[in-house]
Amino acid sequence: MAKQHGKHPDTALAQNRKARHDYAVEETYEAGIALTGTEIKSVRDRRVNLKDGFVQVRNGEAWMQNVHISPFKEGNRYNVDPLRSRKLLLHKKEISKLGAATMTKGVTIIPLKMYLKHGFAKVLIGVAHGKREYDKRQDIKKREQQRQIDRVMKHY
């Protein structure tokens, strides 16, 4: 058995901070991404924007759309379109679950976080449905109440 070294946390390269505010995430999946050489260099430089991204299931494959990976500075002719569709690497069972989930009205799949794991770029995707304004207000109210409880408990 191989010797285990200390566990390193996944290095988050990009996060979709608005996602948990605008959507209620029900389930998450970890997916690999098929990237070109210059794209992975840009990802390592943290030049990624997940804000407008979403995932589509087409012909038994999962594709990530609208995720902006900036062109690599020294990439010249090897750079590709920053907003191109990128294939996600998932098991067939996971893809079929995602496909079934998107058939439900109001459910979407969004990228939550991009990180490196053992040298490979991974994306944490979430099956989510959009929050309404009153849902957001309830979340803010709960957070404020928790802060007040923490403040009071800090003194005792």
Swiss-Prot record:
Biological processes, Gene Ontology terms: trans-translation
GO molecular function: RNA binding
Subcellular location: Cytoplasm
One Gene Ontology cellular component annotation held by this UniProt entry: cytosol
Coiled coil spans: none
Highest taxon above the source species: Bacteria
Keywords: Cytoplasm, RNA-binding
Gene3D superfamilies found in the cross-reference section: 2.40.280.10
Cited PANTHER family: SSRA-BINDING PROTEIN (PTHR30308:SF2), TMRNA-BINDING COMPONENT OF TRANS-TRANSLATION TAGGING COMPLEX (PTHR30308)
Family: Belongs to the SmpB family.
Official protein name in the record: SsrA-binding protein
Source species of the chain: Lactiplantibacillus plantarum (strain ATCC BAA-793 / NCIMB 8826 / WCFS1) (Lactobacillus plantarum)
